[in-house]
Amino acid sequence: MTRDEDNGFSEWGGYFEAKKSKLEEQFAAASDPFRKSDLFQGISIFVNGRTDPSADELKRIMMVHGGTFHHYERSHTTYIIASVLPDVKVRNMNLSKFISAKWVVDCLEKKKIVDYKPYLLYTNQKTSQPMLIFGKPKDNGANESKSDVEPPKDKAEVEVDSTKDETQMELGGILKNLQQAVATSPEKEASASESKITNLSTTSNNSTTARTAADPNFLSEFYKNSRLHHIATLGAGFKQYVCRLRQKHGTQGFPKRETLKSLANSHHNCLERYVMHIDMDCFFVSVGLRTRPELRGLPIAVTHSKGGNAATDVPVHPQADRKAELELFAQRFEHHFHDGDKAEKVRSGFDKKMSLSEIASCSYEAREKGIRNGMFVGQALKLCPELKTIPYDFEGYKEVAFTLYDTVAQYTLNIEAVSCDEMFVELTDLAHELNVDVMAFVSHLRQEVYSKTGCPCSAGVAGNKLLARMATKEAKPNGQFLLDSSNDILAYMAPMSLDLLPGVGSSISHKLKQAGLNNCGDVQNTTLEKMEKVLGKKLGQNLFQNCRGIDDRPLAYEQIRKTVSAEMNFGIRFTNSVECEQFLCQLSEEVTKRLVEIRRKARSINLKIMVRAAEAPVETSKYMGHGVCDIINKSSLIKYATDDVNVITTVVLDLMKDADIPPDELRGLGIHLTRLEDANEVRKENNIKEMFGKMSEMRKDKPIPQGAVGDKSIGDDKVNKPLVFENKPKPREPRNVLSMLTAAAVSRKSVTEDRSQRGTSKPITRPLSLVPKLDEDVLAQLPEDIRLEVIANREEHLCIAEYDGYRSPQYPTLRSPPLLNPYVTTNVSPLKATDLKPSTSRAAVARLQKRKERKEQEHYIRSDQIVADYIDDLPDFVNPHILKLISHPVEMPELLMGDNYKDLLNDWVSREEVPKPNDVDLILKQVSRMIKNDQLDHVCDVMKYWCRIINMKRSSSCCWHVAYKHIEESIQNQMLTIEGYSLLFIEYIRCIKCS
């Protein structure tokens, strides 16, 4: 889609340029009340990276002294303030003036604009034409004040600061390189697009901005200029920061703990374990008010919107239909996600021309007016017309977050990072080993954080993570609370809403409400059996315990990334498949870069596709937003983990091709990599290849003994080969077990008659020279599991050789009977290579015995596999055995137990518009067998995948919905009969008609 004259944004010169202009207008409006001089009148600056003074301080200086502060580099930016630039920027430098922040300080000191040339960091000068220096840099060495000299720090502070210096720049890179396009959950479909891109701008001097994802520069431009994704990645960044602090600290002590001696406990601590949950109060608002103290006490909201009249008269595309879009979103929230609050939010704030920007954070004064985080700005202004809005301050968030973590790390590193402003801390060692009064320490810590950051925080302390988080809710705002044995935990938890507990979302909450369970008190009064029936065994047990204040989860100090993803649901407007493929190639490169940077490889590749819903308007209420969409997930599991961009790109393109979606219907694309493995792990086959190479080199170095060659010439290239497999037997044709038994019986009869005639018994054996010989040196170098497999393979050949020796030549080999059922195999062993590994585990022995029994059972051929004319050709003495086999019942093939069950279900659903009753009965029998075999996890996997592909059918598929619900109901009835509880299926049929 190209931008035309009637799209509502042409008069601004584009959406991104409008955002830039909005930020400049905000800055100008905020500067007027505080302006003291016009020293920097007509001068604009843009801060690139870390500087001294900081970006916030430079912004305040420009605000007070008449200058302009650009949030993004623009063509008319006067100076770019920086301390250091990467090499790529230096080599690609244009005519921009990169100067030191010292220039601003010196201008203030002299109260005039000084020459910028001495403060230039880099220039485009050449050795043949050096730059002319018109002035000398000012020597400021004598003007340093004593207050600028920091006092000496103790050892612990130096260690934390050194790690921070090493990590902060890396974390800045992590926050940029681990960019996750803010993943829009289904609950946020109605509003997340605009909030993602409001901070987006361009650095192009011309109006050649990348307007849609079809533009080759769109993806790089989005990630280069949009900083809102930092919110989603700050948590991951600080989890890595805590890991690095722990690794660097090792077994060293904490000198800062010496200051806690004054906090000695006068009485015995009442809990065996102390867990603290610390959370900053209204984090975004608190950081923003540090530079806006005049706004304290007023209702404040952090958002991209200006507020005021600008938030109630937003331009809307002429072809957009807000009313239709509103109703579609509301229906989905109510019927699919069972979230009435979200539906009400859409209905009350998704009308007219009101701003759909979301409020990221609001002050407690605003909350008293009914405003909540995530609310639309237009809706909030209806509740509170005097609401003040402030912009994001990402550098400030990072600065305060580092200070918070560094302060806690001076006392303990038993930290579980949750986000940039929230963490769990284990205080048991401080309480018992140092005999410290826990609440006195918490008060001391909170005061230290406030003195360093100017931002308040609250803390809750209890015996586990769940109660500690609950205690924090009691402590807010700016307080602390201890939930110990003196409190009646059951009475405290009883009125708590169930959606406050971990793992309880809108879907689980809806099921609980249907069962008459609205709060923790209701669960306390019910039985464990009922909870397991409603939610399944595992989740039912967890919720049953949590409602009683029981939580055994330990703190996760070193958290390993389990997924890496990159997603884009703004500006996805393709006109052909070529544009779509080009964008997917770029997105694959982006997600691969993130994967490499965390030193991981992925085995599972998932492609998330957002397709415009059939009933949704083509143009969305939000410019270039995704609107109401159907979400399709396609996944592929590759053989080996990879971080190769070519492999990932190929898989992604294949998945997109399989989806077969028209390009103009796409509204969002995302790549998610899972099943991550350590990139430093080397695959076993590589080690084996290397071992064979070393053995070959060793053989070359060994002298050949005289006479070892025999009659062969010295030049024969087969002499020095380390392994000789020339006599390796050819692969045998698959033989039916019945034919082998028949031939063996005939051979035994012949041998018996021959022995009786001769009176002697001499075993008839096959020459074992045809069995491959093993090199003992090579065998000794093999890993244990491979060596056992090779030995077992050789023993198998020996057994075959002995068996062939008993074959009677007077009876030809009988032909194998035809197999009527292609799913039944007779000569495939269920044992894997790893099963040959010796194990002392009783469970392992039991598994091997069970597999052995299954293997023996599979050798039987059922009656439906035997053809009548084949039976007639058999000798008479074999017929009784065949008749005995015929009397055995026929076993159903296990269609859903293989690795290809997804392909089977996918083909079935895609090929049939209406499921046949016989097929449904077959699937039901398969699932029932799995339940009887206690394969409940596989039942859940099968039902989850089947439900997903049914939901993906865009045509009328209510017949499939009925079939699925029929099988689901049968499964639950069988589970209640056998196990006494029901299974929890996280996927469900999303159909308003069926509902």
Curated annotation (Swiss-Prot):
- Could you tell me the keywords of this UniProt record? DNA damage, DNA repair, DNA synthesis, DNA-binding, Magnesium, Metal-binding, Nucleotidyltransferase, Nucleus, Transferase
Kindly identify the residues recorded as the active site: 422
The cellular component terms of Gene Ontology attached to this UniProt record, alphabetical and capped at eight, are: nucleus; replication fork
> What region holds the UmuC domain?
275-505
Q: Where is this region: Interaction with PolI?
A: 696-868
Q: What protein is this chain from?
A: DNA repair protein Rev1
Cofactor(s) of this protein: Mg(2+)
Q: Which family does it belong to?
A: Belongs to the DNA polymerase type-Y family.
Q: Which domain of life is it from?
A: Eukaryota
Which residue ranges have biased composition labelled Basic and acidic residues? Answer: 136-164
Localization, per the record, is: Nucleus
By its UniProt entry, which InterPro entries does this protein fall under? Answer: BRCT_dom, BRCT_dom_sf, DNA/RNA_pol_sf, DNA_pol_Y-fam_lit_finger_sf, DNA_pol_Y-fam_little_finger, IMS_HHH_1, REV1, Rev1_C
Q: Which PANTHER family match?
A: DNA REPAIR PROTEIN REV1
Name the phenotypic consequences of knocking out this gene: Highly sensitive to ionizing radiation due to defects in homologous recombination (HR) repair. The percentage of full HR repair is normal but the length of the repair synthesis tracts is increased.
Quote any Pfam family the record assigns: IMS
Which molecular function GO terms apply here? damaged DNA binding; deoxycytidyl transferase activity; DNA-directed DNA polymerase activity; metal ion binding
